[in-house]
Amino acid sequence: CHEKANYQPSDARTSSPLATVRTAYGRCGEESTLLVAALRSVGIPARQVYTPRWAHTDDNHAWVEAWADGRWHFLGACEPEPVLDLGWFNAPASRGMLMHTKVFGYYDGSEEVMKTTANYTEINVISNYAACAPLTVTVTDTAGSPVEGATVEFKLYNYAEFYTCLLYTSPSPR
């Protein structure tokens, strides 16, 4: 893909793979969309992965995971590297709070399901990039009883602000 598109930042919405080829440029969103389409066109399962905010800068990033040898491997979109699981973002991803992707339809895999809709399932794939451990959050009222339907915001502190990475409303007391 690096032969078809050069990186160029913009604030525009993500364009289609064909538009990226026609203009010969795009940001990480366009480049990763192009590579996912190219890999899928030759029968390689692929998905776009996204972090809404890095721990070290007030910016986001998108890249690609491709299925090979029984597991997902990551690669930069139009950033050629000689091997899989190597990118400029290895170190930042290891400190990230959230790396996610959307799977069309219902998903019953090993990754944490963050959101399910009629059309897609959003999953957290951070365990592909960093050591993780389960975290249980219990919201209680002043009497110490669990609160049903409590909303919890998971935030990342960076650039003197708390950025919401995930908003979770519990369906039951937790």
Where would I find each of the regions flagged by the language model?
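Extracellular ectodomain segments of secreted/surface proteins
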Residues: 112-132
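Hydrophobic/aromatic-rich core segments of domains that either
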Residues: 1, 5-114
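Conserved small/polar residues in nucleotide/adenosyl-binding loops
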Residues: 168-174
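Conserved beta-strand and immediately adjacent loop positions that scaffold enzyme active sites
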Residues: 63, 136, 151-153
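Membrane-proximal bilayer-interacting regions
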Residues: 50-53, 59, 125-131, 148
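Short, ordered, surface-exposed loop/turn motifs in non-cytosolic proteins
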Residues: 142-160
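A short, amphipathic beta-strand motif
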Residues: 133-141
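Short, intrinsically disordered, charge-balanced linker/junction segments flanking boundaries
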Residues: 162-167
